[in-house]
């Protein structure tokens, strides 16, 4: 493998098409980059995961720390919101829980927004729709 690296490093190469690029017409020589192959000494060992003391992976006495806190978001407390407000949002937000209805709502909303914007956009944005702004200049014989 070392002989291939030294062989590639000794022979310079000429790039075609660049011979006449300089004023004198000299050829451009490029030496390829020398590549060296290094072997890394890597120690291989067993990977050990530890939990707590003495490599205990699952502790039946401490389920909360073993499996995580599952009831972080759960609460038995009554809702802090007004019951009428909760009923309103449960009634009118229920159709938007399904993807199809939400998609239809977004399409209708986007279409109505596009219609409104296109109806209120100024019409004379392009010069071709405005027409000539100055009288035409006469040519050399008094013609347009």
From Swiss-Prot:
Coiled coil: none
UniProt subcellular location: Plastid, Chloroplast thylakoid membrane
Range of the transit peptide: 1-49
Keyword Amino-acid biosynthesis on entry: no
GO annotation, cellular component aspect: chloroplast thylakoid membrane; photosystem I reaction center
BP-aspect Gene Ontology terms: photosynthesis
Membrane topology note: Single-pass membrane protein
Transmembrane segments: 104-122
Keyword annotations: Chloroplast, Membrane, Photosynthesis, Photosystem I, Plastid, Thylakoid, Transit peptide, Transmembrane, Transmembrane helix
Pfam annotation, one family: PSI_PsaH
Major localization class: plastid
GO molecular function: molecular adaptor activity
Family per similarity comment: Belongs to the psaH family.
Protein role: Possible role could be the docking of the LHC I antenna complex to the core complex.
Protein name (Swiss-Prot/TrEMBL): Photosystem I reaction center subunit VI, chloroplastic
Organism: Spinacia oleracea
Gene behind this protein: PSAH
């Amino acid at each position: 493998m070392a002989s291939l690296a030294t062989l590639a490093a000794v022979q310079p190469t000429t790039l075609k098409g660049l011979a006449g690029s300089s004023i004198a017409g000299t050829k451009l020589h490029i030496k390829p980059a020398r590549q060296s192959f290094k072997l890394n000494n890597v120690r291989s060992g067993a990977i050990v995961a530890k939990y707590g003391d003495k490599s205990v992976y699952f502790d039946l006495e401490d389920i909360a720390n073993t499996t995580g806190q599952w009831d972080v978001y759960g609460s038995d407390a009554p809702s802090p919101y007004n019951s009428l407000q909760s009923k309103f949002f449960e009634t009118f937000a229920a159709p938007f829980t399904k993807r199809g209805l939400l998609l239809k709502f977004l399409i209708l909303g986007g279409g109505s927004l596009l219609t409104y914007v296109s109806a209120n956009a100024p019409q004379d944005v392009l010069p071709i729709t405005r027409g000539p702004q100055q009288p035409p200049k006469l040519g050399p014989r008094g013609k347009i």
